[in-house]
Regions:
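Select subsegments of transmembrane alpha-helices in polytopic membrane proteins
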Residues: 50-60, 154-164, 224-232
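Alpha-helical multi-pass membrane helix bundles of inner-membrane/thylakoid proteins
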Residues: 2, 100-161, 219, 247-252
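Juxtamembrane transmembrane-helix termini in multi-pass membrane transport proteins
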Residues: 6-75, 170-187, 205, 210-211
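Membrane helix-loop-helix hairpins that form the core translocation module of multi-pass transporters
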Residues: 43-135
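Transmembrane-helix boundary and interhelical-loop signature of multi-pass inner-membrane proteins
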Residues: 63-88, 98-105, 175-186, 190-193, ...
């Protein structure tokens, strides 16, 4: 009876931890970036959920390996994963900032993928520096102007999921294993992912609705785009410096 009660408490804690984990700084920045460059709320929601799905996939694979085989990523992986996330956020933030200076930031024929955004962001920086130092090219170079596929959005979610394996999270899963076996540990993992998906889905819906509501209000849209870019660049820089752990908790 005691073990059964403790198991239920462990599963509930895993679900709550997943819900809280969904409200991390990098999730807010990434989902906001995705929403800010889409022309329709449905596209913002779809691409946001692709990112969320990639993140959840990484959590599922790493969590299952830890539970079933007691395998986890080496401690050093946290450092390079944190910096990799920082790079994606800084480059995407700079790209979103570029849309702030364009007359029609949402005039895409098709939503652009995350890798397309990363490449075009770097090309835009290169073009802008060239213009400052005497370059004559009028139009910024771009690749895949109309966007191709959705796999890159999913891939960036996978990258961002590499930093999700926390000691507290693993301790809960292993506690569930001790109380109810491997099956209970996997159930704890599923409840964690369910909490994560719930929070991130709410975030995607909120971001999609917010940006969609500003499409007919140019000043509000440009202000929101500027704030999104600034937030992404600042958070990305913090991650690049390896200081994400010093950020205050958003959930208390």
């Amino acid at each position: 009876m005691v073990d059964s009660l403790n198991l239920r408490l462990a599963l509930t804690s895993a679900a709550m931890l997943g819900f809280r984990h969904g409200l991390d700084y990098d999730h807010i920045a990434a989902i906001s970036d995705i929403s800010s460059i889409q022309s329709k709320a449905s596209d913002a929601m779809r691409y946001g959920l692709l990112y969320v799905g990639g993140h959840a996939t990484t959590v599922a694979v790493l969590g299952a390996a830890a539970i079933a085989f007691r395998i986890s990523l080496p401690p050093a992986s946290d450092r390079w994963a944190e910096r990799l996330v920082g790079i994606t956020l800084v480059v995407l933030g700079v790209y979103v900032l570029g849309t702030f200076f364009r007359e029609a930031p949402h005039n895409h024929l098709r939503p652009r993928t995350r890798i397309t955004l990363l490449i075009n962001g770097l090309l835009w920086i290169y073009w802008r520096l060239g213009r400052l130092f005497g370059g004559t090219r009028v139009e910024a170079p771009q690749v895949f102007k109309d966007g191709y596929g959705t796999g890159s959005t999913f891939l960036v979610g996978i990258i961002h999921g590499l930093g999700a394996e926390t000691p507290t999270q693993l301790l809960l899963f292993l506690m569930a294993v001790n109380l109810g076996g491997t099956a209970a540990g996997l159930l704890g993992l599923l409840t964690f992912i369910a909490g994560l998906l719930l929070m991130n889905t709410l975030m995607c819906a909120s971001a999609a609705g917010l940006f969609s509501a500003t499409l007919g209000r140019p000043f509000a849209l440009r202000t929101l785009t500027l704030l999104t870019s600034a937030y992404s660049i600042v958070v990305g820089t913090v991650f690049l410096l390896g200081s994400a752990g010093k950020l205050p908790s958003l959930t208390g």
